[in-house]
């Protein structure tokens, strides 16, 4: 089961991850917003926000530290206008897998500062040890958006199917409205 608390009406299907990222950022972010992005990462996770005019802080990780996330750096990066924290786990391109404790701390920091968490989870389910699979962010936090696709975990890239899952009805409705101008029918 992908999600513990998400109902089908809380899942919005897209034509792959790229469309979901583009939709989220255009529907939810504004040009004066600030976002923090786990880096290195899939380029669209920061470049779409740059194109909108957002201020982007790259939350850099380094090989010599085992790609570990620095939570103090995250706290220091938050500004008055920080709207979202963008995370990716299991991580592309490093393979880093944060601990459940680190994931929970990120959620708590986001909650404290009323930030959205956009969690790129396209490699979720491919962990070598299934016991290390993290919960979906959308199951942990009411203002989290989890991104999934068929191409990675399920090995079905030709279908071009992606989705977001969220409890936040405002985010869902904003994305659904914006998506109406992109595609009206995904791969069938």
What are these model-derived regions, one by one?
Residues 4, 33, 83, 114-116:
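The start of beta-strands in P-loop NTPase/AAA+ ATPase cores
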Residues 142-188:
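Conserved core segment of the aminotransferase class I/II
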Residues 1-34:
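Phosphate-binding glycine-rich loop
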Residues 21, 45, 94-95, 172:
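Glycine/Thr-rich phosphate-binding loops of Rossmann-like dinucleotide-binding domains
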């Amino acid at each position: 089961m992908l999600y513990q608390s998400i109902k089908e009406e809380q899942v919005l299907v897209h034509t792959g991850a790229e469309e979901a990222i583009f939709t989220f950022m255009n529907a939810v972010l504004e040009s004066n917003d600030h976002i923090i992005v786990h880096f290195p990462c899939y380029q669209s996770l920061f470049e779409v926000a740059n194109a909108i005019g957002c201020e982007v802080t790259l939350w850099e990780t380094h090989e010599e530290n085992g790609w570990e996330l620095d939570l103090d750096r995250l706290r220091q990066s938050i500004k008055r206008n920080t709207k979202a924290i963008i995370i990716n786990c299991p991580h592309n391109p490093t393979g880093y897998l944060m601990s459940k404790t680190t994931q929970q701390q990120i959620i708590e920091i986001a909650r404290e500062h009323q930030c959205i968490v956009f969690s790129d989870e396209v490699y979720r389910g491919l962990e070598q040890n299934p016991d290390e699979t993290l919960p979906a962010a959308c199951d942990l936090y009411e203002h989290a958006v989890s991104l999934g696709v068929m191409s990675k975990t399920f090995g079905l890239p030709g279908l071009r199917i992606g989705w977001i899952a969220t409890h936040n009805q405002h985010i869902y409705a904003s994305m659904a409205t914006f998506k109406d101008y992109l595609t009206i029918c995904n791969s069938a």
